[in-house]
Amino acid sequence: MSHRKFEAPRHGSLGFRPRRRTRHHRGRCRSFPKDDPSKKPHLTAFTGFKAGMTHILREVDRSGSRHNKKEVVEAVTVIECPPMTIVGVVGYIDTPRGLRALTTVWAKTIDNNTKKRFYKNWANSNKKAFTHHEKNFDQKAQDLLLKRIEKYCSVVRVIAHTNMSKLNLRQKKNHILEIQVNGGKVAEKVAFAKSLLEKEVKVDSIFAENEMLDVLGVTKGKGFAGVIKRFGVKHLQKKTHRGYRKVGCIGAWHPSRIRFTVPRAGQLGYHHRTETNKKVYRVGKGDDASNASTAGDVTDKAITPLGGFPHYGVVKNDFIMIKGCCVGPKKRVLTLRKSIIPQTHGAAKEIINLKFIDTSSKIGHGRFQTVEEKDKFFGRDRTKKVEAKSE
């Protein structure tokens, strides 16, 4: 009989504590890439909504790789990114205790769906948010505040909100977040932020193909889970008294308390997580009917698969396609940020050459890429049906 091992590395990382539900549904972006004054002023983050996953076929162009000049199939995630609206500017002063906000400048008009974010129940509220601001708005006072930011501040950020009315989701309240302006001098940053007030910003003005980005979001909620699923500890033998899906020993006699490092049952999922260095494979236009076409597949087809993305629907706006998976379930709002750690390895610098994007149905085993291809296979003629209905 072989001997048993009496030592093993601990199960469950201590770097992700406490494992409880996050207070923020949207990914919080509390740090931004390092500023480079030599570049032009630009925004560093955006928001998107997870639509679903599919797969692509591409040719690897990375010398030294064993897959170089070969075709590979990779999983990708499609994130719908409707345009965001800039409604404010915030200036920060760098103090010994960190950044401190000097003042906030709001645009003249604020969308009602944005005002709803300041109330728990918009229908039963007095709806007085920003009424005094809009009634007594003064352009000269706004310019004075912007000059004050230009004089005293070292960090400039804009206040942006999503446009939920452009999405087919139940959520109607717009998500609000701050986006840092990097590049140029402070005066150029303030002028750039002022030029964006009350205007829509599209995702292709911030991110580009072959770029690396970070994804900040909240994971899927799993509810109350035991130690086997929550920490991955090994279950006990089958003859163990009073259950075997548990921890055999929760600690010594003394100290006479349970340490925080001991795996215990509790909340699993709905945690805030940051995934770094995701490769952008495509930045697509929502109004382009052939935004899923490639050089190797010239078929006119959209990124939405047949039948729509499961539990999401049709992608009608601009979108970003990134390599691999990302946090959260379908419809979860994600914060996309420019990579905070510059990457210089071969995979980061590789130019992506897509040959094929799969748009078959994700409900079951899809075999057709377009509706026309499916109709041709089954011998259907949709023109006759349309003529019959018109008669």
Curated annotation (Swiss-Prot):
Keywords: Cytoplasm, Ribonucleoprotein, Ribosomal protein. It comes from the Eukaryota. Coiled coil: none annotated. GO terms for biological process: translation. Pfam families: Ribosomal_L3 (PF00297). The L3 protein is a component of the large subunit of cytoplasmic ribosomes. This is Large ribosomal subunit protein uL3. The lineage of its organism: Eukaryota, Sar, Alveolata, Ciliophora, Intramacronucleata. The gene is RPL3.
